[in-house]
């Protein structure tokens, strides 16, 4: 069987979950640290209304900046997120079938669910979870979302997060992300992952670790914090949540620069968590 290109992996997952009944959404146009931060997860997992969606989410973690030199760790990477609310009884079976659609033979390969309860301190989110390992390499995270913004999720939503970059490493049998086949073409049309993303990886790493202005980022954090509070008072939880995301990213940038002490870090986490909580609380009040 021909190995899937990076974009074919995405298309295969989109088609699989579309056939199951998920709405295929688009990436959120904000700097987020993971697919979970998309409002389609944070806000829509709350309340009783059924919600089944899937989407790709480019994600940024300034602290993982490596100037494009690390084989599988980058400050910018891709996740494929699936939310099923309420969580179906056969969600694990659905996930395993999706791996088969990607060409992974479950009879040959060692697929393990390794207990790893998930928590996001800044979102005030948590759930029972498992890392999914394929032949010893983590390729997905599987979570029963029980709490977001400090609010219980009723019903519990099932969350599946595929690490697209690492999953592609395994499927294509290569050792470095930059060597991944991006588009499945040959000759002049062929593209590798490195040709698409790695110059940006180098430049953003330099910015994140050397050139970002900490004083400016501190101002941005406070401005977003104040704006979020103001928008909540105006009953606008969705734009308020955008400001929460901006504050969260500013905090991540400050953390990557190493300008925040351990004590200050705990304080910033609590401040972002407060913003997430008031956004979630207001959203739920307006969407019961």
Swiss-Prot record:
EC number(s) on file: 6.1.1.14
Q: What InterPro entries has UniProt attached to this entry?
A: aa-tRNA-synth_II/BPL/LPL (IPR045864), Gly-tRNA-synth_heterodimer (IPR006194), Gly-tRNA_ligase_asu (IPR002310)
List, alphabetically, the Gene3D superfamilies matched: Bira Bifunctional Protein, Domain 2, Class II aaRS and biotin synthetases, domain 2
Reactions the enzyme catalyzes: tRNA(Gly) + glycine + ATP = glycyl-tRNA(Gly) + AMP + diphosphate
- Detail the disulphide connectivity of this chain as listed in its UniProt entry: none
Per the record, its GO cellular-component terms are: cytosol
State if Protein biosynthesis is listed as a keyword: yes
The organism's superkingdom is given as Bacteria
Subunit composition? Answer: Tetramer of two alpha and two beta subunits.
**Stated family:** Belongs to the class-II aminoacyl-tRNA synthetase family.
What protein is this chain from? Glycine--tRNA ligase alpha subunit
Taxonomy, top ranks, is: Bacteria, Pseudomonadati, Pseudomonadota, Alphaproteobacteria, Rickettsiales
Q: Which gene encodes it?
A: glyQ
């Amino acid at each position: 069987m021909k190995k899937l290109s990076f974009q074919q992996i995405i298309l295969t997952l989109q088609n699989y979950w579309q056939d199951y009944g998920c709405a295929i959404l688009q990436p959120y146009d904000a700097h987020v640290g993971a697919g979970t931060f998309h409002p389609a997860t944070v806000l829509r997992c709350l309340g009783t209304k059924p919600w089944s969606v899937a989407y790709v989410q480019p994600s940024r973690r300034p602290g993982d900046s490596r100037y494009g030199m690390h084989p599988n760790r980058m400050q910018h990477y891709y996740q494929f997120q699936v939310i099923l609310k309420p969580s179906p009884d056969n969600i694990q079976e659905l996930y395993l079938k999706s791996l088969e659609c990607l060409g992974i033979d479950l009879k040959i390969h060692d697929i393990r669910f390794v207990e790893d309860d998930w928590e996001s301190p800044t979102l005030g989110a948590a759930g029972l979870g498992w890392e999914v390992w394929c032949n010893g390499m983590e390729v997905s995270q599987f979570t029963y979302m029980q709490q977001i913004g400090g609010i219980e999720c009723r019903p519990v939503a099932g969350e599946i997060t595929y690490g697209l970059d690492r999953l592609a490493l395994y499927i294509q049998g290569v050792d470095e992300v930059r060597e991944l086949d991006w588009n499945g073409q040959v000759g002049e049309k062929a593209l590798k992952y490195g040709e698409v993303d790695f110059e940006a990886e180098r430049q953003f790493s330099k910015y994140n670790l050397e050139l970002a202005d900490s004083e400016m980022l501190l101002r941005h954090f406070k401005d977003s914090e104040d704006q979020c509070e103001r928008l909540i008072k105006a009953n606008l939880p969705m734009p308020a949540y955008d400001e929460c995301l901006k504050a969260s990213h500013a905090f991540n940038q400050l953390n990557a620069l190493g300008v925040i002490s351990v004590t200050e870090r705990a304080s910033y986490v609590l401040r972002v968590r407060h913003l997430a909580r008031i956004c979630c609380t207001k959203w739920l009040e307006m969407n019961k």
